């Protein structure tokens, strides 16, 4: 598992668009599901992506959650999982870290 948390001072829609564009540039990436909420002056978006990891030889998922209250900053949390191999220990997590790096490069 790898995790990225950021606080961004820009528009919610701009951040969401950059996330979606960055992830979907991968040939094997798919948007598995999504959910969007609005309540009073808050917004939340959840995206679950999956892609094939050539390094790990398996599929890796990434959950991205964006949250904004009013005109405050956009909070982003991205967590990848599923890229390790082995039954009892987490080894070979390159795929998880590489998937997360697709966001690091655009945020």
Segments from the language model and where they lie:
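Terminal, regulation- and interaction-focused segments at domain boundaries
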Residues: 1-27, 31
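N-terminal catalytic or cofactor-binding beta/alpha core of small enzyme domains
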Residues: 2, 12, 22-24, 44, ...
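Short hydrophobic/aromatic-rich motifs at helix boundaries and adjacent loops
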Residues: 5-6, 34-36, 75-76
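Conserved active-site and cofactor/substrate-binding residues in soluble primary-metabolism enzymes
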Residues: 10, 14, 59, 94, ...
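Ser/Thr-rich, low-complexity intrinsically disordered terminal regions
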Residues: 20-63, 70
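Beta-strand/loop substructures that line and gate deep hydrophobic ligand-binding cavities in soluble
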Residues: 56-91
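A conserved amphipathic terminal alpha-helix motif
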Residues: 86-107
């Amino acid at each position: 598992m790898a995790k990225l948390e950021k606080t961004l001072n820009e528009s919610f829609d701009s951040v969401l668009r950059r996330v979606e564009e960055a992830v979907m540039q991968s040939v094997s990436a798919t948007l598995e599901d999504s959910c969007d909420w609005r309540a009073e002056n808050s917004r939340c978006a959840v995206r679950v992506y999956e892609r094939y990891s050539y390094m790990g030889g398996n599929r890796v998922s990434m959950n991205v959650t964006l949250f904004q209250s009013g005109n405050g900053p956009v909070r982003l949390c991205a967590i990848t999982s599923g890229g390790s191999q082995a039954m009892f220990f987490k080894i070979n997590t390159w795929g998880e870290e590489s998937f997360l790096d697709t966001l690091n490069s655009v945020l």
